[in-house]
Swiss-Prot record:
This is Gag-Pro polyprotein. GO terms for biological process: nucleotide metabolic process; proteolysis; viral translational frameshifting. The lineage of its organism: Viruses, Riboviria, Pararnavirae, Artverviricota, Revtraviricetes. It comes from Simian retrovirus SRV-1. Its EC number is 3.6.1.23, 3.4.23.-. PROSITE patterns: ASP_PROT_RETROV, ASP_PROTEASE, G_PATCH, ZF_CCHC. InterPro entries: Aspartic_peptidase_AS, B_retro_matrix, B_retro_matrix_sf, dUTPase-like, dUTPase-like_sf, dUTPase_trimeric, G_patch_dom, Gag_p24_C. A motif (PPXY motif) lies at residues 203-206. The record marks M100, A101, L162, L163, M217, A218, F300, P301, M526, A527, Y760, W761, A874, Q875 as: Cleavage. The gene is pro. A motif (PTAP/PSAP motif) lies at residues 211-214.
Amino acid sequence: MGQELSQHERYVEQLKQALKTRGVKVKYADLLKFFDFVKDTCPWFPQEGTIDIKRWRRVGDCFQDYYNTFGPEKVPVTAFSYWNLIKELIDKKEVNPQVMAAVAQTEEILKTSSHTELTTKPSQNPDLDLISLDSDDEGAKGSSLKDKNLSCTKKPKRFPVLLTAQTSADPEDPNPSEVDWDGLEDEAAKYHNPDWPPFLTRPPPYNKATPSAPTVMAVVNPKEELKEKIAQLEEQIKLEELHQALISKLQKLKTGNETVTSPETAGGFSRTPHWPGQHIPKGKCCASREKEEQTPKDIFPVTETVDGQGQAWRHHNGFDFTVIKELKTAASQYGATAPYTLAIVESVADNWLTPTDWNTLVRAVLSGGDHLLWKSEFFENCRETAKRNQQAGNGWDFDMLTGSGNYSSTDAQMQYDPGLFAQIQAAATKAWRKLPVKGDPGASLTGVKQGPDEPFADFVHRLITTAGRIFGSAEAGVDYVKQLAYENANPACQAAIRPYRKKTDLTGYIRLCSDIGPSYQQGLAMAAAFSGQTVKDFLNNKNKEKGGCCFKCGRKGHFAKNCHEHIHNNSETKAPGLCPRCKRGKHWANECKSKTDSQGNPLPPHQGNRTEGPAPGPETSLWGGQLCSSQQKQPISKLTRATPGSAGLDLSSTSHTVLTPEMGPQALSTGIYGPLPPNTFGLILGRSSITIKGLQVYPGVIDNDYTGEIKIMAKAVNNIVTVPQGNRIAQLILLPLIETDNKVQQPYRGQGSFGSSDIYWVQPITCQKPSLTLWLDDKMFTGLIDTGADVTIIKLEDWPPNWPITDTLTNLRGIGQSNNPKQSSKYLTWRDKENNSGLIKPFVIPNLPVNLWGRDLLSQMKIMMCSPSDIVTAQMLAQGYSPGKGLGKNENGILHPIPNQGQFDKKGFGNF
């Protein structure tokens, strides 16, 4: 053993010197490890004693076979690198004398080492010879070495696994020199099956391309060797058959099906293909369906079974009805591109589906229009894939991908390669994701804007969904989506994102705007109203410095107490002129004590600071009242006209006011007091520009003898509206007053409260509750219609459990209060008995006694509630009115009588 290690070390040392002559430096220890690996994979190499390019390539083939069999983890990292270096040495040995000398010396070392190894023990078989052959490149046969002292108990290293120890010679053994080695190798190859699992210790790979006789080895009886190998193969076959039988029995126990066929008679064990790209040998097509012998894996169209001989059989089965039903339900309730629906599609697509299967599935699940859209997108994706396949040269064309032409039959499509099934799956699922969402136009990304009360996360989700339909995937346009997420957001979210716009991503945007909701929007509108700005201007200017102004000179940078430019004039006190208030005497207006002016009109009370006590502040109110009021009482004569041709006098609010749709009509102060000029009355009308901004001004009549403050009745129509101080919002039109001899109930109007206080709604109350039956998504619901609710509310007990609901950020107020109530996740289609329909998104609240139909639904139904008057109805009937028909000659006018009641405490134009 010591001699063998010494020779091995000398061989490695010579090789290191040869590599050094080529300019390659290697470590001695690494070369030792490399040749240890060579001895393990190529036991025949040290025994041959010759190094040439042909034998070294055989070593490379052994390396490659070992790598393919056991994987890269069993092969040293530097094995192939050192093999290439030594190959270059052998190729260049004729050119470099030093390398040639090193190779020759190494061959001598190998021959000596091989001879020493084979002669370590005395021989017990005098007829056994050792055959030593030179390289084929030298063209001469090696001399035979006969030594009667050699022992046959030492096994040769050509087939270390299959050979066993031999203790006695067989008298019938042929002469080793007469053995046909190539013929024996061909016969042994017939017993090899590539589908059998590898042995625990595989024999070293053998390269049949070398036709030469075996190299230096201890010759053994080839018949005994083949007998042992055949016995091992027969035992392997028996074990494999037993394994298949046990699998069949286990399958029978799991499924409880006693009719499962055995591996010898039918398909063997079945498997559902889940690995696209893994090539499996295919055999005949089994077109018949096993209707009563389906296992859980047989619910998918294409399956594959392998029999006991390793032959693969493909089967095609119909879709399981439960899969189609589940996918159809998800597409109908949530939409074809909803996350839940896409999850089911991807689960089905993980299996092998032919183009015909995809077409059948889509036609059964989607509507006719969506099916055509999917088919057009699928064909377009297949064209692109076919072009790439043509460039790659794999032969998978458009007909194969779409199942048309020569591949229109199911039998032809069943034989597709797994990689082709994967391409069909990718094209089909990509086309499914391109389907449009019903009710969402999705024309362009720029049209997706955040609503005033919409959560930012919902807005980003709509943006990403639209981008996915346009770009194919949201990741393709992520930068564009991020830009639009800021630009199309509402002002509140833009203000929150602006400082971190270039410092975070889209996820950071969502985190910054997570707390912005309806309550935040209302507070923001109030803050903007206090500052006298719009919401957008307030958000843009809230971080800017606000410099104070001098009250004396009006310049910034100092206060009035530090102003040096103000010069106090000590001129003599001037005598007062004609009093501008009463126009009766010469005195200061603040000292005027007259009650009426020179024309007899009553004068308003004094304004300004009072004689005693602090000056009262402006009356303020949170909603609809005066914010930052600067109210001053002015007579009608102080009003101005916009132009000489203006018909009315301009009216404006004396304060910044915030109006919301929930507040209804509100009275806005103008600071203008009556009375009107003699023989006139006033008519208040809103300006058209204010109506466009969402503020509705109600018409009103001002009596001639009204001495109170003139107010404007206004209402926010849809959104929160800010009424700035001093902006013209209405006009007062003065009209001539015609006096009549009608009876007068009160002699003087005076400062009576503005507006009418005696109008009320009259409705007969009965024991019957006015209810209405509607169908929401074809499910019947009954609810009240006179509740006064703004939104529709369904009690939780009537809500189907499979209908999705989500939490909301809004609070519902009324008789009680519900914080963060549940709401339907999607819009429901309502339908009445007359087949009128629309969309609503109701709230769901538990423990309600009855469902409530809100104004969001009743406004779509155009329901009108009225209080009929018996007197007026009788008058209309006497004049020829037909109930249920309209007024007028053609009976196409108003269908219901107009309730009316006299107001005897009123006087003036329009009252009777």
